[in-house]
Amino acid sequence: MNNFELILLYYGKKIFMSFVKDFKLLLKARYPIIYINTYEEERVEYVIKSAIQSFTNRAVYSWDFIEGYCNNPNDNGYAIRNPLQALEFIDKFTLETPLLVLLKDFHLFLNDISVSRKLRNLAKSLRNQSKTIVIIASDLTIPLNLSDSITILHFPLPKNSEIKKELLRIQESLGYSLPEHSLDNLVKASQGLSLEKIRRVLAKIIATYKEINVESLDLVFKEKQQLISQTQILEFYNPVTKISDIGGLNELKSWLKFRAASFSKRAEEYGLPIPKGLLLVGIQGTGKSLTAKSIANEWNLPLLKLDVGRLFGGIIGESEARVRQMIQFAETISPCILWIDEIDKAFTGSNFNNDSGTTKRVFGTFITWLSEKKSPVFVVATANNIDSLPPELLRKGRFDEVFFIGLPDLKERECIFKVHLKKIRPKSWSTYDTEILSAQSNRFSGAEIEESIYEAMHIAFNENREFTTSDILNSLKRVVPLAYTSQKNIEELEDWASAGKIRLAS
């Protein structure tokens, strides 16, 4: 087995070969400038050099701002702190051997007029030569004037097979092994981390626990939370809400239960398509967000929440880069749940006309991914105002289903009261008259029911006694439900849903 085959085995056959295949194709087609977006600088450099050795004889040089050309045999350290001189070296390279140059962190210099002009000139001349520039950068920031000259290639983070190989290697070096089930849990917990991050986390685990065990998974989750928070657009949730914690919504619950095994290997072998997602439309406080959290728990999948407001940046092109970053990260973590709360606030009709096309481009990128994605990312989007959503979002093929979550009926309200009271008073919940409470809370949302219980608790707490059914009834009388304060809007939404244009969750 040669060196390239060993690396192929180590990094995982499918993903590694996909990247190598694309990279080889770009080299053969003489693409002058390749931009590889990755945090794993050492890993991608190692993979590129090894892949090149397997099919071509090329001189490979690498440059960075501090050390210059560190492996130039004629002038080690050439072009230190001088990106323009680094490009001139490529231009003047006269050896007959084909050349590949790795420029690290070079995205930081692309807005310099001298550097960008030199790159554009090189892009023209390199098409007729066996020279290729590879920019390795953690951020995807390409000025518009270079967009035609540069080809983007994403280097994926390791998938489960790669992570497992690395964990087995580390286990072997430490001289002990985890049970298969514990190993699988650790692999799943490590999804979305680079191999270097995984090594560091394992070092921290060993320093803390003296061994790799089930309890050490918390450190992996904390590392992942920190990594996700650095994106500033995604938030990692550890879902604790169960589907049984939600009152009513029986149709929606049945739909979710029916598809609980859709991400399994058995479903894939059967030929079932990967589920795309759900759009939950309805009145505020009816449990849309709670449902999103419960799906992750029910299906035992990680939950990412997208802050749609932070997708939009002030710099031209920044918003588009952020949505691509979001997609790339979600696909790396997959299988997972991507929760997009109040999507209607981001993609309203007015936004499409007021920001020079940014919303339109971001929406276009998102909607294309939603329709064409092959990765097991299940999108759960919630919306309060159906009228403000673009019609393209509601077309068949975007989501597997669109559900309307309305105000709970009499039986559902009683169920909601029971759910909350069981959680608050697990031993004495049955002493409360949920039938009367349900009858006296007509047009209340689930959130308003919950708030009335807590209001009753506050009153009883200040009087140093246990709260009663009467306390809750008094709290209900003091609350003016949203169904009355926004009566017209809610009735229009209910009429639209009852006309058969959307599937009802109850």
Curated annotation (Swiss-Prot):
Q: Which Gene3D superfamilies match?
A: 1.10.8.60, P-loop containing nucleotide triphosphate hydrolases
Q: Name one GO cellular component term.
A: chloroplast
Q: Where in the cell is it found?
A: Plastid, Chloroplast
Annotated keywords:
ATP-binding, Chloroplast, Nucleotide-binding, Plastid
Transmembrane parts of this sequence: none
Output one GO MF annotation. ATP hydrolysis activity
* Keyword ATP-binding part of the UniProt annotation: yes
Q: Which residues bind ATP?
A: 282-289
The UniProt record lists the keyword ATP-binding: yes
Write out the similarity annotation. Belongs to the AAA ATPase family. Highly divergent.
| Protein name in the entry | Uncharacterized AAA domain-containing protein ycf46
Species source reads Guillardia theta (Cryptophyte)
